[in-house]
Amino acid sequence: MYKGQVLIVAPLSGHYATLLRETVRAMLADHRVFITDWKNARTVPLEDGSFHLDDYVNYVQEFIRHIQGVYGNCHVMSVCQPTVPVLAGISLMASRGEKTPLSMVMMGGPIDARRSPTAVNNLAMQKSHAWFENNLIYRVPPQFPGAGRRVYPGFLQHAGFVAMNPDRHASSHWDYFEDLLKGDEDAAETHRKFYDEYNAVLDMDADYYLETIRTVFQDYDLVNGTWDVRNPEGQLERVRPQDITQTALLTVEGEHDDISGKGQTRAAHGLCSGIPQDERQHYEVRGAGHYGIFSGRRWREKVCPEISRFMLAHNDTADTPEAPSTVVVTLPSDTPTQTVLDLAPAEQKTDAVAVAPVSV
């Protein structure tokens, strides 16, 4: 049964959207799928300008409007980092009286980073904004199109990811070596595929990165009700999640998530007080870590079916397009860190364009 169309907002925290390959593959069985992919900041010429967290929020809204206008209303699914800007974008749409998505699914994200702080949260709390700027921001070297641009390099983010669980990575590589000795090519190939994605990293624009650190992990502007986003017209708008009334909410957390701690994503329910209780649901994935909520066996057998059931229950029967297959549409942008929006929906051509920019 066709269960609706969904925009998957991929994270901009060091990896490409291909990290969600398994997420998309599972969702395609029952849904028309759209996914964002953010450009590597080192490939964006300096003269194209900078990219800010506000730009991310504005692009999320533009994506939603584009899909609504061409295909009808949709569900929005955000994985890790984008839970915060996605909630902000939908909140702003609700405050203006715009049509909001049918549902929003928020998975393993730092809505309230104060809850059950992890090593990621502790670093942000213990270091000053100036420390991050002075120690983690570099200029793109001359051999790249974005030469001179200030970025948070992907290689630093990758080193941070590995440093969080060095024993686990060492054990994984030892198992890989033993699989090769035993001739277990299937297990070895699984290892190679995972690390091909895990080791592929991108650079992030410095302004976006530093603003995310301050807004999400230091000042907690979303949960404190003090976040003002500058819209494309240059006006500041206050983010008010309590204004959302027509969008159902599902939050998903992994029991052993060591990146977004227990309760951080669930906090969205307290902020979205305008959504009726029977339109809100929380799902904790027993035994799952951070990656287990969107890839692997638990994702395929538990999480994905739960999300699909939730979306089906909140579908708009007036918007019932054909069953999903595949098409890819590239959306050009007039701003520096534009994104490519990959559509995996029904086989049809479209002249529609939209814009966008910024991964787990």
What do these predicted ranges mean?
Residues 43-46, 57-74, 86-87:
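Conserved acidic catalytic loop of the alpha/beta-hydrolase fold
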Residues 69-72, 85-207:
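Alpha/beta-hydrolase-fold enzymes
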Residues 78-86:
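Gly/Ala-rich beta-loop-alpha elbow adjacent to hydrolase catalytic centers
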Residues 245, 251-253:
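Short beta-strand/loop motif that positions the catalytic acidic residue
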Residues 272-290:
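Catalytic histidine neighborhood in serine/cysteine hydrolases
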Residues 287-301:
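Catalytic histidine-centered segment of alpha/beta-hydrolase-like enzymes
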